Amino acid sequence: MKLQKPKGTQDILSVAAAKWQYVEGVARETFKQYHYGEIRTPMFEHYEVISRSVGDTTDIVTKEMYDFYDKGDRHITLRPEGTAPVVRSYVENKLFAPEVQKPVKLYYIGSMFRYERPQAGRLREFHQIGVECFGSANPATDVETIAMAYHLFERLGIKGVTLHLNSLGNAASRAAYRQALIDYLSPMRDTLSKDSQRRLDENPLRVLDSKEKEDKIAVANAPSILDYQDEESQAHFDAVRSMLEALAIPYVIDTNMVRGLDYYNHTIFEFITEVDQSELTICAGGRYDGLVEYFGGPATPGFGFGLGLERLLLILDKQGVELPVEEGLDVYIAVLGADANVAALALTQAIRRQGFTVERDYLGRKIKAQFKSADTFKAKVVITLGESEIKAGQAVLKHNQTRQEMTVSFDQIQTDFASIFAECVQ
């Protein structure tokens, strides 16, 4: 049997991994500017953590979760999204305590798992960057978090990003709209897809989010949720819009956007861009003021977003964005003969300890093959080390582009390689 990776997973090899590391690094730097700290939660959770928070009737829970019973007969699931585990951790670790400064701002980067049909930018194991902010009901928190995502996309060089915005209102306005939507959709129930017929009974707002053609036709003239906002909900949404305008962040109102998870209220949003004449969501999130309480904590407002790393990298590639990934070695050491093996090892370590990236030959190859490796690795400087160099206590350094050479002592290399390197590559 030929062993291969499971369907819907990927091996991220070193060249690609460098791009991942760059994007993750830019995200970390951006989040730090907004005073976010990293949190790392387990890759698996108790089933109830996800099912109760995400919603028993969502596609994630009914169709997409990897869940199983462990040897202790505990119902476990691989995490399909990041918010619920972070909220569970927030409550379990009592980050709501008065001595903890509010708002609590956290970000995460890690693997998520959903059993779905693999396609471009969508896998069964995928990677997500997300942020969660706890303790502020201020609409400025909504806008700051949206602005942080917008700032990240600007730094990465993504073009043509559009912010789609909607409000689900509070519990009262959402309940009023839910009934209005049921009244609107019920007469055309038979024209809906099978999934949306089920959603109409369980969670009618999810019909608005359907990608099926017949459902899109059915909801084309559906009542707008914004017409059912009470005074509190309207004031919150008006404040969000005015603050976005103050920051010159353009947006469009999308009243059919409801998000795929049940815990949202008030502001929800998506950032969308076009790739190959198709719209792709890069990032999505919103406000969830009841989730901490649902997990047994005190009533605590929350706001956050998540974005898929695979999809983000796909968009960067499709848009032709060149990521400034560092390539190549600083130094390649060509080793001539077994007698030079120990000296080469010592020299390699001495240069590395001074902050340089170094590789050497371990295979005892001819000098021509070693120089070819130096070219392949894009080494800036090549050091040739053989029996004569060891006897003299000196090494020959060559600029790998200009081919200019210089001879320096081992002592100089071991104590002040930075000066030698700068002189060699100037």
From Swiss-Prot:
Protein's GO biological process: histidyl-tRNA aminoacylation
Compartment(s): Cytoplasm
Reactions mediated catalytically: tRNA(His) + L-histidine + ATP = L-histidyl-tRNA(His) + AMP + diphosphate + H(+)
GO annotations of cellular component type: cytoplasm
CDD domains xrefs: HisRS-like_core, HisRS_anticodon
Keyword Metal-binding: no
Keyword terms, alphabetized: Aminoacyl-tRNA synthetase, ATP-binding, Cytoplasm, Ligase, Nucleotide-binding, Protein biosynthesis
Enzyme Commission designation: 6.1.1.21
Keyword set includes Repressor: no
GO molecular function, one term: transferase activity
Stored Pfam families: HGTP_anticodon (PF03129), tRNA-synt_His (PF13393)
Quaternary context: Homodimer.
Family to which the UniProt record says this protein belongs: Belongs to the class-II aminoacyl-tRNA synthetase family.
Name under which the protein is recorded: Histidine--tRNA ligase
Record organism: Streptococcus dysgalactiae subsp. equisimilis
Gene that specifies this protein: hisS
